A protein has these predicted regions:
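Charged (often Lys/Glu-rich) extended helix/loop segments that serve as interaction or gating elements
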Residues: 1-171
């Protein structure tokens, strides 16, 4: 007790500070479109609203990196999701939604990764149910270390199939 005030019990929940590095999401760029004379969009093979809901709900920003083509020339693009919703995009900065990504050449694949997303994005988006605009749930892979310190991967869940979604809907 100090100055007549009992010492308080303080309880905390550190959330993303303790598990932030545990999550990553990888997307492929499935299309690129020129919206107008200034906006170019790279469209991912999923939805930010369903797989990274904090980017939409609270404008959370994550570590974002191009996975391949690092030696290519870069360009300013916007990243958009597959849904019909105008809010399905990655809000990179407060006043600029654009990010810099390698220029995509003809017949070239491009991948982008979001890292340090913690353990909450999957639980917020839901697992195994029906997502916004019927976007299927992604494949889930666990990366771990064995007793020798070597990395290994194991499949936790396959990408959600249209048949499983139709079954949930009663078809």
């Amino acid at each position: 007790m100090n100055n007549g005030v009992p010492e308080p019990n303080i309880f905390t929940e550190f959330g993303s500070y303790t598990v932030g590095e545990s999550g990553a999401m990888l997307y492929s760029i499935v299309n690129q479109k020129q919206q107008n004379d200034r906006e170019k969009w790279n469209m991912i093979d999923s939805s930010f609203m369903t797989t990274l809901p904090d980017t939409w709900g609270i404008n959370q920003r994550f570590v974002m990196l191009a996975i391949n083509n690092w030696d290519s020339e870069y360009e300013r693009v916007n990243l958009g999701g597959l849904t019909c919703d105008s809010e399905d995009f990655y809000n990179a900065e407060a006043h600029s939604n654009a990010v810099f990504m390698p220029k995509i050449k003809q017949n070239e694949e491009q991948y982008v990764g979001f890292f340090h997303m913690g353990a909450y994005q999957e639980s917020l988006g839901g697992y195994g149910g029906i997502q916004h605009c019927l976007i299927p749930g992604p494949k889930l892979v666990v990366i771990d270390l064995d007793e020798n310190g070597d990395y290994f991967t194991k499949l936790f869940a396959k990408e959600q199939s249209y048949k499983s979604m139709l079954k949930i809907l009663g078809y």
